[in-house]
């Protein structure tokens, strides 16, 4: 009887050990899968968001935006006020993403290069969104000087809750927010103060408006 009870105990221990061994790989696999999933999210998320906190950051962004598609499906977050008064900055060539200004200001903007379609953004693409930002500066290009705006030379996206304070000067299609607001463009809740000069199609908010402009104020 003693031998029989000892054998039964040994069998019970063996069964328990086998059950534990079967459970451990599944648990380890689940933990590894969770870790892999977390690492995947961490690797991909930052690639879609760009943070700006200095003039150098903005200059690098402008270089990247020479390629029209670079900013598409990206979010740009302005994390601090940026002063451009002591740097060489010629505007952002083309923007097609989402710009979150977070109520910060870009000051000291000075654009004087020759050509048309000038502004902080030369082109705001269809589907793009620029919002919650103040721009202060002087935009007086040389040469043809058409389609000049404080925020955008040409807008085919949405500009909302933005303000411009300063001087915008050109020949035709001159506006405090946008030189041209295309048929796909929308400008909403924006404000302009300062001076806007031009000969043809001149407006405090937008020079030539083919789209929607609403709830804006003009003190230019």
Task: Tell what function each PLM region has.
Residues 29-220:
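Surface-exposed repetitive/solenoidal architectures
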Residues 12-22:
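Bacterial N-terminal signal peptides
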Residues 1-14:
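Bacterial N-terminal signal peptides that target proteins for export
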């Amino acid at each position: 009887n003693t031998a029989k009870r000892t054998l039964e105990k040994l069998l019970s221990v063996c069964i328990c050990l086998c059950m534990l061994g079967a459970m451990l790989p599944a648990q380890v696999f689940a933990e590894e899968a969770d870790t892999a999933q977390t690492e995947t999210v961490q690797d991909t998320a930052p690639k879609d968001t760009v943070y700006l906190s200095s003039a150098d950051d903005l200059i690098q962004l402008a270089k990247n935006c020479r390629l029209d598609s670079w900013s598409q499906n990206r979010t740009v977050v302005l994390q601090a006020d940026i002063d451009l008064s002591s740097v060489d900055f010629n505007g952002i060539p083309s923007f097609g993403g989402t710009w979150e200004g977070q109520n910060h200001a870009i000051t000291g903007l000075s654009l004087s290069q020759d050509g048309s379609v000038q502004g902080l953004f030369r082109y705001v693409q269809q589907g793009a969104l620029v919002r919650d930002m103040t721009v202060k500066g002087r935009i007086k290009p040389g040469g043809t000087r058409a389609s000049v705006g404080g925020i955008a030379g040409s807008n085919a996206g949405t500009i909302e809750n933005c303000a411009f304070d300063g001087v915008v000067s050109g020949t035709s299609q001159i506006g405090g927010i946008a030189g041209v607001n295309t048929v796909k463009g929308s400008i909403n809740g924006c404000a302009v103060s300062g001076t806007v000069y031009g000969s043809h199609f001149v407006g405090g908010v937008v020079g030539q408006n083919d789209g929607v402009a609403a709830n804006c104020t003009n003190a230019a």
